[in-house]
Amino acid sequence: MARYRHSRSRSRSRYRRRRRRRSRYRSRRRRYRGRRRRRSRRGRRRRGYSRRRYSRRRRRY
């Protein structure tokens, strides 16, 4: 029984880790895509503001 419980916890931790990594990658990809589009459209005017906002969001994630 002890062995079964150990394997179960191990699989659960592995699943959780994989899920977290995938979600983080997806969020990062979307953020980079949005930033690139905004920079090309607006230019250098709003660069500092966008950077500050993104840093705050990154900290939360």
Swiss-Prot record:
Nucleus is among the record's keywords: yes
Region feature (Disordered): 1-61
Major localization class: nucleus
Function of the protein: Protamines substitute for histones in the chromatin of sperm during the haploid phase of spermatogenesis. They compact sperm DNA into a highly condensed, stable and inactive complex.
Gene name linked to the record: PRM1
Native source organism of the sequence: Macropus giganteus (Eastern gray kangaroo)
GO MF terms, alphabetically ordered: DNA binding
Protein family: Belongs to the protamine P1 family.
Family annotation (InterPro entries): Protamine_P1
UniProtKB keywords: Chromosome, Developmental protein, Differentiation, DNA condensation, DNA-binding, Nucleosome core, Nucleus, Spermatogenesis
GO CC list: nucleosome; nucleus
Compartments where located: Nucleus; Chromosome
GO biological process, one term: sperm DNA condensation
Protein name: Sperm protamine P1
Superkingdom of origin: Eukaryota
Tissue localization of expression: Testis.
UniProt keyword Heme, yes or no: no
